[in-house]
Amino acid sequence: MFKAMLSSIVMRTMQKKINAQTITEKDVELVLKEIRIALLDADVNLLVVKNFIKAIRDKTVGQTIEPGQDLQKSLLKTIKTELINILSQPNQELNEKRPLKIMMVGLQGSGKTTTCGKLAYWLEKKYKQKTMLVGLDIYRPAAIEQLETLSQQTNSVFFAQGTQPVAKTTKAALSAFKTAKCQTIICDTAGRLQTNETLMDELVSVKNELNPDEIIMVVDGLSGQEIINVAQTFHKRLKLTGFIISKLDSDARAGAALSLASLLQVPIKLIGVSEKLDGLEQFHPERIANRILGLGDVMSLVEKAEQVFDKKDLTKTISKMFLGKMDLEDLLIYMQQMHKMGSVSSLIKMLPANFSVSEENAELIENKIELWKVLINSMTREERRHPKLINRDPNRKQRIIKGSGRKMDELNKLMKEWNKMQLKATEMGKLLKTGSNPFGGFGQFF
């Protein structure tokens, strides 16, 4: 999210201990300067940066310290607290009132229509409740068609009335909503390239007709500082209740988008973390603060795993692995489940900075996993369950190569690395029994 992790700046520029009784301006001057540069480089709003730096300075300079106290840890704790303060606002979670009426607004290209579908999917998964999706973008027929497709994919009710005035369509949608056995209605309003009075008047007419519980602006995570003025215009006319930041799975610096909560005092409710329908997550200020600091987001990673893996199956697979009995069938299922959690790159971003892997290496890992899946899928079930059969029989290897369209050396590398993994897993199992650290060097296989 931010190119320069704030924790690495602190570690690099600030000495661990000082002998004085209080922290002085000089002790923190360099680190605050570099943090300021990092935040501005990430497109965080200047006013937000100034307030952030001032808050850290006020809380650290003059602070009484114990002899030998670790200043780095102390400063990181203060930075994290202030980051959470910037990102946090009251009513952070989506309104739990039912029936729930949501009005979605935003600029063209922000991912608003796609986000409507993701939100319907998120509500269904989280609350097991049905949603009605209403197409009000009468200026872009493709948007209404897209919303209809999304409604089919999310098992939602779809409503639209072509090019009818949006207020009239909203009124008709509300009538249909009352009899549709849906708990939530989401109105996808027209996106524009820029704000103007005509657009705002139209949105106000929808608001007056719908009387929404939530007015959510979808903001592109790639947006620059101009999004702040746009959001202020929307908020002035509509009184926004929240933001959804889209495209946070990209290399977006996202500083401008994340500045909105502090500047407008409006909460960020959800974030888009992938292009898939399940790529919407609740916004947790503390977790985002951890990512910015380079401390990772292990809680979100655990939640993703819990959604994908069956606990009993996972326990069984891990037990087989440590006993050296995990076969290629188990590995294939495991890789398929991992794929459901997201790309290797997106998962690595949730790990602390000291576990970081470059984008290039993440891509290599992704490619290797896809290659292995192709090769393993070209094996018979008997071969997957008894990999030694492949090494013993050249004819089996030839058949797998022919079926997969891959090269012999790629299959040989898979089998060689598989054997290494089996040996390493067995060693790990033995180390676990003795209470030693079993994970040293295991990552080399990917």
From Swiss-Prot:
Any coiled-coil ranges, and where? Answer: none
| Keywords associated with the record | Cytoplasm, GTP-binding, Hydrolase, Nucleotide-binding, Ribonucleoprotein, RNA-binding, Signal recognition particle
* Pfam families according to UniProt: SRP54 (PF00448), SRP54_N (PF02881), SRP_SPB (PF02978)
Cellular compartments annotated: Cytoplasm
This protein's record includes keyword Nucleotide-binding: yes
Q: Does the keyword Transferase apply?
A: no
Please describe what this protein does.
Involved in targeting and insertion of nascent membrane proteins into the cytoplasmic membrane. Binds to the hydrophobic signal sequence of the ribosome-nascent chain (RNC) as it emerges from the ribosomes. The SRP-RNC complex is then targeted to the cytoplasmic membrane where it interacts with the SRP receptor FtsY.
Q: What is stated as this protein's family in its record?
A: Belongs to the GTP-binding SRP family. SRP54 subfamily.
Quaternary structure? Part of the signal recognition particle protein translocation system, which is composed of SRP and FtsY.
Looking up PANTHER family in the UniProt record yields: SIGNAL RECOGNITION PARTICLE 54K PROTEIN SRP54 (PTHR11564), SIGNAL RECOGNITION PARTICLE SUBUNIT SRP54 (PTHR11564:SF5)
What name does UniProt use for this protein?
A: Signal recognition particle protein
Q: Which organism is it from?
A: Mycoplasma genitalium (strain ATCC 33530 / DSM 19775 / NCTC 10195 / G37) (Mycoplasmoides genitalium)
Q: Give me the gene this protein comes from.
A: ffh
